[in-house]
């Protein structure tokens, strides 16, 4: 919670700090923050964006490979051109070269015993008949249940009273179905089913149009299109369109004083105070724990912030000399019940002659992988890739390098990604809108607050648009 001593110390240093003013201060220069700032500036209001990092982009971060040929996304990496209209508009605006996700060929699955089998993309894995029938039943049940929820205001106390694991058990899910659903939560949120409210997870699915659409690699799905230049293209483009001086990098916010008595909010950052009429914060909820608020946030917001959790979620990009998996008839998509990678996807860039498998390390197997030495991490993934694609004899010869970034060590993402989760009991007791509702002169954006495509870039952009509309309306009336 907000520490009054810390707050007093922050405020006491105000007399030594330099100051300036703006109509609106936006905290965070990711997609939500930059979108909000763009819209505020378009309305002829002055704006300052305070970003803790030394770069823009937030959880979109693209890096060139060491040889200068090809780019990998350490963070968010997919969009689509059907129902992610706002981020797709940015792709067109900034001349993104789009790469369609490969779904031609077989997928591979690794079962709980380590056995490997393959199946065509879009079909169920090659389980026995009873297991296959139950996986389809549980999948369709989750799809149907998530579709009954209101996207912005889900309300089901029964679903929120239990974990997603308990929900599955109450529906008689088989061992194979439980393992399949665990792959979903690990790949989507880096968490185990036991740690997530059933209501929260199902609403998360609904925010992306449903479980099937959110997990799909085909048109309209959550993983349909990549950008050759990398997804940070959008944030860099938005930043380049801002007037000079709007974005302040390396400026972490330490305190927000909404109790000045003069109608202005004071935002404290590194020896400087910025006074504003309105503040839009777009940082992840775990980061809000590190900001002192005066007065403190309302109980509903404070409880939500203290309740959110990240699991373990990291992408490891394995670069190879050739797309040997394609030559063997695979599309590159795999799932595993045991890990280390729960899901693998082909993220190659043919135009750059770069052949890449992105391994998603999430949840319990992710934590185990993180505890390994760098050499053992690499070897464990090479072994798994060799097994999944029947390439144990060539995988090490084909291997070039591993590229990764551990968001769990990133202070300004809140020590995790892609999106926080909630345990049972929070949504129903606080109300689904508690986090995004304005309070005093503070407005809340970021992909966590989104109704549609929560946890995705589309959700971030839409949340920034919403927050901008809120402040513009209040400042213009």
How should each PLM-predicted stretch be described?
Residues 16-18, 69-71, 145-150, 210-222, ...:
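Short glycine/proline-rich turn/loop motifs
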Residues 251-252, 257-328:
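Central helical "cap/lid" subdomain
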Residues 147-252, 262-265, 282, 286, ...:
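Active-site/ligand-binding neighborhood in enzyme catalytic cores
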């Amino acid at each position: 919670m907000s520490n009054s001593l810390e707050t007093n110390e922050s405020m006491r240093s105000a007399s030594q700090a330099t100051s300036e003013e703006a109509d609106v201060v936006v905290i965070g220069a990711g997609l939500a923050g930059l979108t909000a700032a763009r819209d505020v500036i378009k309305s002829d209001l002055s704006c300052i964006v305070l970003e803790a990092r030394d770069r823009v982009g937030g959880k979109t971060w693209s890096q060139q490979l060491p040889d200068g040929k090809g780019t990998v996304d350490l963070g968010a990496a997919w969009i689509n051109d059907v129902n992610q209209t706002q981020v797709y508009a940015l792709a067109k605006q900034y001349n993104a070269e789009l790469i369609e996700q490969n779904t031609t060929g077989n997928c591979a699955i690794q079962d709980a015993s380590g056995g490997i089998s393959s199946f065509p993309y879009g079909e169920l894995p090659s389980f026995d008949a009873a297991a296959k029938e139950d996986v389809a039943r549980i999948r369709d049940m989750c799809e149907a249940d998530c579709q009954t929820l209101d996207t912005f205001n889900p309300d089901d106390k029964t679903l929120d009273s239990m974990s997603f694991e308990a929900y599955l058990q109450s529906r008689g899910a088989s061992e194979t179905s439980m393992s399949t659903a665990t792959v979903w939560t690990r790949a989507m949120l880096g968490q185990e089913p036991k740690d997530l409210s059933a209501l929260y997870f199902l609403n998360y699915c609904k925010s992306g149009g449903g479980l099937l659409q959110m997990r799909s690699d085909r048109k309209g799905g959550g993983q349909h299109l990549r950008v050759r230049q990398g997804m940070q293209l959008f944030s860099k483009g938005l930043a380049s369109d801002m007037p000079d001086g709007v974005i302040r990098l390396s400026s972490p916010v330490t305190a927000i004083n909404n109790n000045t008595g003069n109608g202005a909010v004071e935002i404290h950052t590194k020896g400087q105070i910025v006074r504003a009429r309105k503040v839009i914060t777009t940082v992840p909820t775990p980061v809000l724990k590190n900001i002192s608020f005066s007065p403190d946030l309302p109980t509903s917001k404070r409880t939500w912030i203290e309740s959110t959790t990240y699991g373990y979620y990291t992408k490891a990009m394995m670069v190879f000399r050739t797309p040997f998996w394609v030559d063997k008839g695979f599309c590159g998509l795999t799932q595993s019940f045991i890990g280390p990678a729960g899901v693998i996807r082909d993220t190659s860039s043919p135009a750059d002659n770069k052949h890449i498998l992105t391994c998603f390390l999430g949840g319990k197997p992710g934590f185990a992988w993180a505890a390994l030495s760098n050499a053992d991490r690499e070897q464990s993934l090479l072994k798994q890739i060799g097994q999944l694609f029947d390439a144990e004899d060539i995988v090490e010869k084909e291997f070039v390098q591993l590229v990764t970034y551990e968001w769990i060590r990133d202070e300004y993402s809140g020590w995790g990604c892609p999106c926080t989760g909630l345990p049972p009991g929070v949504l129903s007791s606080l109300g689904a809108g508690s986090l995004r509702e304005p309070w005093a002169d503070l407005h809340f954006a970021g992909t966590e607050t989104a109704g549609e495509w929560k946890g995705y870039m589309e959700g971030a952009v839409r949340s920034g648009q919403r927050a901008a509309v809120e402040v513009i309306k209040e400042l213009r009336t």
